[in-house]
Amino acid sequence: MPLATELELPHFDHTQPGLRGERYRAAMAELPSHDGWLAANPYGYTVLDREAGEFFLRTKEAVFPGLTIAQLFGISEGPLHQEIVRNIINVNGSDHRRLRNLVNPALAPRAVDRYRPAMRRFMEQLTDGLPPEGRCDFVSAIAKPYPSLVIAEVMGAPLADAPRLHHWSNWIQRQFDATSLMTERELIEAAVAEFYAYEDELIAARRPAPGDDLISALIQAEDAGDRLSHDELRNLVLNILVGGVDTSQSQLAHAVRLLAEHPDQWQLLRADPEGLALPAVEEALRYEPITPFTARIAIADIEYRDVTFPAGAIVLVSAWHANRQGIEPDTFDITADRPRARVLTFGAGIHYCVGANLARAEMQEALMFLAQRVSSISLDGEPEFGTASGIYGLESLPVRLEL
């Protein structure tokens, strides 16, 4: 059985700074996704089909490489090291099951539903603040402030602190970008330390006087007599902050961009906002995943499809390719019958995104409100895309909203 290192594979470097927008989509589309299922990248290998992606996301012989990255960059102490070691994405086995059993009820669909009225209220406030002609940068006007307000509501934090929460989330999530770790580590460390201090005050206030918020729910969470420690609680809240702000901002912006580029789909959504808002969210997650690659590192030799991946091999699972497999033609269609299981944007297996229900609800309420309030959406300039090395978002999205 050949080693993966012995194979002649197409090479793809998704970290190239200029690989954005149309260039990014063209480069991704050129990679094989049917006959060929594997490519090489600067760090290891990229898996290009859904079945193989599911395997590497679910196998116990591969884990998220957060601890390896910390060692590689010499992160051996301090708040960032503490966060990486205790982050639920880097915890496995029985410890991971225990944490998920404690946190899942607080983020179940029914629990998330109680935040929907606030989501609608925030969308109304942000839309009311648009100029009368409806011309704006959708990212700065709505997509950026909206999830920060939602996460403040979810945490039970003052809404006035939403910009600070966005600032911390923006910096903390850069720990997943190797380039940022090399050039901006001190700023990432500072953001982690500042957020820890901030949430410690919130936790201390909630213990004697719980409210109807996530922190209170996690403080009271209990499974067979077990409760979260203080460090576990603060790291789960940090994880939810990072997963609930930048990712939601980027995915919502892409959803609106896609609807602006496909006016027929916008009119379908306008005709049935309540029925098609969630399918529109699912189609945006499938078509333009803001986490196009999910990393794993082999902790033992892995044999798959007659190939041996040696221990230490880094594998990137391409949700972009997996989400498209078997779909012909590959068009953005919010009325198509797409099985949710086909989408790997939130991952798969035990490390499936803990905040997926919250993210879906945020985007669903935002699109539903816009469809009820806005008659048409059109691009008012060229979108500015970010890089695909971490979260693949939009720096700006100039649009015109006919209110």
Set out the residue ranges of the language-model regions.
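Cytochrome P450
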Residues: 1-403
